Amino acid sequence: MNEFSILCRVLGSLYYRQPQDPLLVPLFTLIREGKLAANWPLEQDELLTRLQKSCDMTQVSADYNALFIGDECAVPPYRSAWVEGATEAEVRAFLSERGMPLADTPADHIGTLLLAASWLEDQSTEDESEALETLFSEYLLPWCGAFLGKVEAHATTPFWRTMAPLTRDAISAMWDELEEDSEE
């Protein structure tokens, strides 16, 4: 697993799973103890420090639920809610064609798309590099800026207000890397 994959896996997990999910305990422990920064491949120390200082799990969970859960959520985490004419089925078909195992949850969720990027990067054949470019250019970039802007605007906790720019910068850095790789 390389740095690109780690970024996508960490960010994808934080968006995909509710904060109280037992599978996130080790990740939140790393954040709370300031140890995530030691393994974080981007220069985002200030943002990571802000995350570390804002790990009140009750507040983080309540904010997550208000932001992302239910029909009345403040910021729908699904591509189909942001891109006119987009469907979850087209994302599911794209990922299925590449052999990615998918759960019954919506495939166009921001967390699923970031986890898919990690999975595709871990597969790492020439074809998967092209698949990663497609994932970013068609399924992530067209809406993630608006989505993250709304997360930042509607979040009531410093944690989620910080996750938005942290994610935005990471996605931008990963896209830059993909573009550089495709030019070689």
From Swiss-Prot:
Coiled coil: none annotated. InterPro entries: DmsD-type, DMSO/NO3_reduct_chaperone, TorD-like_sf, TorD/DmsD_chaperones. One of its GO terms (biological process) is bacterial-type flagellum-dependent swarming motility. Keywords: Chaperone. Pfam families: Nitrate_red_del. Disruption phenotype: Mutants show no swarming ability. GO terms for cellular component: cytoplasm; cytosol. Interacts with YcdX. Acts as a chaperone that increases YcdX activity, maybe by facilitating the correct insertion of the zinc ions into the catalytic site of YcdX. Involved in the swarming motility process. Belongs to the TorD/DmsD family. Does not bind zinc. This is Chaperone protein YcdY. It comes from Escherichia coli (strain K12). The gene is ycdY.
